[in-house]
Amino acid sequence: TGLLSPSESAITTGNISYAVTCFTDFGQQQVHGKLNYRMNHFGMQNFDLNFNGGIGKNWLYNAGTYQNFDPGSFKLQFTDYADRTQIYHAGLTRILGEGKGYISLQYKHANSKNPGNFANAAPFIYVGDGSIKKVNGFDPGRDSYVPRNGAYTYTDIMNGQQKTWNFNKGSENRSHEVALLSNYRFDNGLQWKFDAKFMYVPVANYVDFGGSTISEVTAADGYTLDENGQNPYEGLIEGRRTWLHFGKVTSGMFTTELNKQFGRHAVRLGLNEWYYHLNYHSSSLQWTGTVERYPQVLYGMATDPTDPTQTAKRTQFYGFNE
């Protein structure tokens, strides 16, 4: 990695600010490898493996993988990991003109499931002096406030169909990336750079959880633990809203630059072309949950706006896409 000054960033990217640049390690003729490993007392294991070497005189290869197995600081009942990330990359590089330049083709695949992003909410009582008190024995940071069943029913805003959303897949992101990188310095001192990248993201999902005021209910309020209404619930509840974000991304970019030094002056001519297309939609739903670790989704009476009879029914999920 490297740091660009505001002036350099303005010239190369059009942004007047400090910018961080990243460089790919194409490798070397001798076989070289590196392994980093980390763990913590919650059971997280993380390793990063990279190796490279030469093929013949003017060819280099590089490959590597990043793996993260992070169960988080509390157990999620619907999955083993709060963050399960996998990244694989490989590349092939040709050295040009006895070291005057190179051309390299790189590929990267990433797959990340990170339900920990939406699992950090917690109920508590704020004392006022910076400290908090527990609610119903709930221990923030060590207990999960995500429903135990691991799935929701929602109405797809694109076609109106009732579907089931799985907590684990709802936070999934997958991507494929191909990059062509080249750099060559001519005998007259002129240097030419050309970099191009294409990225396709077939799955780019995210989840937002919202809440409301915590209140206490009795059997007379009509909340039950079963669909038949035979098991009334009494205790603390919180009305919750959930937004399910679904996306697909296609992007491409290339940058080319000619530069040459004339005495104390540097002349630079370049072109940047960037393309980004996002196919995005969001569906939302409401539900009422118990206030406890691994809360239960309660049944209550609600009306479906698409029902021509407008008859109230006992359901766990309601208020779709409102």
Model-identified regions with their sequence ranges:
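Outer-membrane beta-barrel translocator/receptor signature
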Residues: 4, 8-90, 94-101
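Transmembrane beta-strands of outer-membrane beta-barrel pores
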Residues: 5, 37-41, 67-71, 96, ...
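Glycine-rich, phosphate-binding/catalytic loops in enzymes
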Residues: 18-20, 211-212, 286-287
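Transmembrane beta-strands of outer-membrane beta-barrel proteins
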Residues: 31-35, 61-63, 101-105, 192-196, ...
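Outer-membrane beta-barrel proteins
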Residues: 46, 70-76, 112-118, 192, ...
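Acidic/polar loop-and-plug regions of large Gram-negative outer-membrane beta-barrel proteins
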Residues: 80, 84, 89-97, 102-179, ...
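Face-selective signature of the C-terminal outer-membrane beta-barrel domain
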Residues: 173-203, 234-322
